[in-house]
Amino acid sequence: MKNIKLTVQYDGSKFYGWQKLNDLPSVQLEIEKAVTKMVHQPVKINGAGRTDKGVHAKGQVCNFIVDTDISANQFLMGVNHFTSDSIVIVKSEEMDLDFHARFSAKSKTYKYILCNKYYMEPWFNDYKGHRKYYLDFDLLLKCRDMLIGKHDFTSFVNDLEEDINPVRTIDEITIEKIDDDIVFTFKAESFLRNMVRILVGSMVDVARGRKSIDWLKNALENKDRQSAGITIEPSGLYLMDIEY
């Protein structure tokens, strides 16, 4: 038996997310079909992060266990051959059998790119978020300082399941102004569903002047989804890296 780890990049605008959803286009389904063609047996792919529809990845990781003589390098070439141009396998490795892409992960890093000028070039529509109004960068930094650390993020998750612990520790948040873009980077051991997008949406509300810093503090304390901001569009979100 072999445990193969793949590092994957994909254009999320072409898929209904990472996870299989009936017969709708998904990254997981396409990779599973590609591997199945190579090994001639059903294969289950485990993903490190379940990115939503429209969310991209530069460093997604998945693994699968299979009885085969095919080498890791052959899987790199073969999966790239059988998948569409919207998916690229950039690395393939054979791991110990106890390795799991999701449960072995030590941290995940997401990036959100927000174009902040009056208009955005149309070819960026699927690859950046967009806000045309002025955003106060100093207020964004104050939001950042409040959100770093261990908190109950119930207010910043959609469809929280009863058995999921909403407490998470954000290790790092960086915010950079790069030309006309504001780039948010979040690093944590794990994230809740839509957590990064809701955090960015809430921070933007404060930076725009619609909400106050105290409002954001209360949103954390209230543990109620209605207390926080919107779920910003998925187009600007990228899963950048998984550390093990």
UniProtKB/Swiss-Prot annotation:
This enzyme catalyses: uridine(38/39/40) in tRNA = pseudouridine(38/39/40) in tRNA
Q: Name one GO molecular function term.
A: RNA binding
Q: What class of enzyme is it?
A: isomerase
Organism placement in taxonomy: Bacteria, Bacillati, Bacillota, Tissierellia, Tissierellales
- A Pfam family found in this protein is PseudoU_synth_1
Which family does the UniProt entry place this protein in?
Belongs to the tRNA pseudouridine synthase TruA family.
Q: Which SUPFAM superfamilies match?
A: Pseudouridine synthase (SSF55120)
Entry protein name: tRNA pseudouridine synthase A
* EC numbers: 5.4.99.12
Briefly state the protein's biological role. Formation of pseudouridine at positions 38, 39 and 40 in the anticodon stem and loop of transfer RNAs.
The UniProt subunit note reads as follows: Homodimer.
The active site lies at: D52 (nucleophile)
List UniProt keywords, sorted A-Z. Isomerase, tRNA processing
Q: Which Gene3D superfamilies does the entry link to?
A: Pseudouridine synthase I, catalytic domain, C-terminal subdomain (3.30.70.660), Pseudouridine synthase I, catalytic domain, N-terminal subdomain (3.30.70.580)
Kindly list the positions annotated as binding substrate. Answer: Y110
Q: Which GO terms describe its biological process?
A: tRNA pseudouridine synthesis
